[in-house]
């Protein structure tokens, strides 16, 4: 993945993102430094995918408050908290957003006895750390994930959990990139991922450009390709993993997991430990984002149902832990019983 989808500009005073709503047809980079633009970019999925949302929020919080003219730390803190709380309203499901905002807050509090300028410097340092750690995490996830795969395998993925959803290497696609470097010749099937087509627009874009064998399928073809024996493993990312292993990911993931179980295909969830939320005991505690009905009936400029027809548009679903073969993090591979194995990751 050559494009870094979320980063700071050279002067380190603007957030730079590739506008993912325009892909694959146009590669347009946006430079943002005000909270409203950054909030809008997250909300509208110009930057999306759990790890990338966290990085955008951290860099966004830094660049938004960098311009502050606050005369003292108390005033600066008030401004910082206002932007932080505003960003927290952008998208509810991916816990990485809240995780990154919490990390930035903790760092602020550690430096609170310093000058405003020193605190700004510390916020830059923390956001750059979040970015750098994400790159390392992706590579480690790739390594652990690859240990479960064999050359020539057929792999099914859903939505986009690749470089575009992170700092440039991805989660579910990380083992695929690593395997590609080692000549594994995977055959990747990418679900289109209705309604916003992250699979069609983003996953095939990045895998095709990387020279990886990728075939696009409509979401409703997953069962068929499994039955035809084309799929040896399902690899998906995650937006929030509860303490018992229940996992929120892009709408449609839970259906794939049920199918995979029926056909005896392993279902792997890949994500950094920042996506694990031990405060959520089960999937019931995960807030699922409901998005505009227009995305379903009028997604890409053409109305597909009569005006007035109701549409339901939850952006995520929760896969019950019982359908998940393993959760692959940068710290290693965990299996059932997830309540114990996930907890151990944080000890
Ligand atoms: O609505 P999106 O595009 O932000 O949803 C993204 C997903 O569901 C991804 O699968 C998930 O964030 C994992 S990204 C490594």
Swiss-Prot record:
InterPro entries: Deoxyribose1P_isomerase_DrdI (IPR043679), IF-2B-related (IPR000649), IF-M1Pi (IPR005251), IF_2B-like_C (IPR042529), Initiation_fac_2B_a/b/d (IPR011559), M1Pi_N (IPR027363), NagB/RpiA_transferase-like (IPR037171). The active site is at residue 239. Pfam families: IF-2B. It catalyses: 5-deoxy-alpha-D-ribose 1-phosphate = 5-deoxy-D-ribulose 1-phosphate. Keywords: Carbohydrate metabolism, Isomerase. GO terms for biological process: L-methionine salvage from methylthioadenosine; pentose catabolic process. Substrate binds at residues 48-50, 91, 198, 249-250. The record marks 159 as: Transition state stabilizer. Its EC number is 5.3.1.-. The keyword DNA repair does not apply. Pathway: Carbohydrate degradation. One of its GO terms (molecular function) is S-methyl-5-thioribose-1-phosphate isomerase activity. It is an enzyme of class 5 (isomerase). The keyword Glycoprotein does not apply. Catalyzes the isomerization of 5-deoxy-alpha-D-ribose 1-phosphate to 5-deoxy-D-ribulose 1-phosphate, as part of a 5-deoxyribose salvage pathway that recycles this toxic radical SAM enzyme by-product to mainstream metabolites. Belongs to the EIF-2B alpha/beta/delta subunits family. DrdI subfamily. This is 5-deoxyribose 1-phosphate isomerase. It comes from Petrotoga mobilis (strain DSM 10674 / SJ95). The lineage of its organism: Bacteria, Thermotogati, Thermotogota, Thermotogae, Petrotogales.
């Amino acid at each position: 993945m050559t494009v870094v989808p979320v980063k700071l500009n050279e002067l380190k005073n603007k957030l730079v993102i590739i506008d993912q709503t325009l892909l694959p047809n146009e590669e347009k980079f946006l430079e943002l430094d005000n909270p409203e633009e950054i909030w809008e970019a997250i909300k509208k999925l110009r930057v999306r995918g759990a790890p990338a949302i966290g990085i955008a929020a951290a860099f966004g919080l830094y660049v938004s408050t960098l311009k502050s003219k606050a005369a003292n730390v108390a005033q600066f803190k008030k401004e910082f908290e206002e932007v932080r709380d505003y960003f927290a309203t952008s998208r509810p499901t991916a816990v990485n957003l809240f995780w990154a905002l919490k990390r930035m807050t903790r760092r602020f509090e550690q430096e609170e006895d310093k000058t405003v300028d020193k605190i700004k410097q510390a916020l830059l340092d923390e956001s750059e750390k979040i970015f750098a750690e994400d790159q390392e995490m992706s590579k480690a996830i790739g390594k652990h994930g690859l240990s479960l795969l064999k050359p020539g395998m057929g792999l099914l993925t859903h939505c986009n959990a690749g470089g575009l959803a992170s700092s440039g290497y991805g989660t579910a696609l990380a083992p695929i990139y690593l395997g590609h470097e080692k000549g594994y010749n995977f055959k990747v099937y990418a679900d289109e991922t209705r309604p916003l087509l992250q699979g069609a627009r983003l996953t095939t874009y990045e895998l095709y450009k990387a020279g990886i064998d990728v075939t696009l399928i409509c979401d409703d073809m997953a069962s068929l390709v499994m039955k035809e024996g084309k799929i040896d493993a399902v690899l998906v990312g995650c937006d929030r993993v509860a303490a018992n292993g229940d996992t929120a990911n892009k709408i449609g993931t839970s259906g794939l997991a049920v199918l995979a179980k029926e056909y005896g295909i392993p279902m792997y969830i890949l994500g950094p430990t920042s996506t694990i939320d031990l405060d959520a005991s089960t999937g019931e505690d995960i807030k699922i984002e409901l998005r505009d009905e227009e995305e379903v009936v009028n997604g890409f400029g053409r109305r597909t149902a009569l005006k007035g027809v109701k549409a339901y548009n939850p952006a995520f679903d929760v896969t019950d832990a019982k359908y998940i073969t393993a959760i692959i993090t940068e710290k290693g591979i965990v299996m059932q019983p997830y309540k114990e194995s996930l907890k151990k990751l944080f000890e």
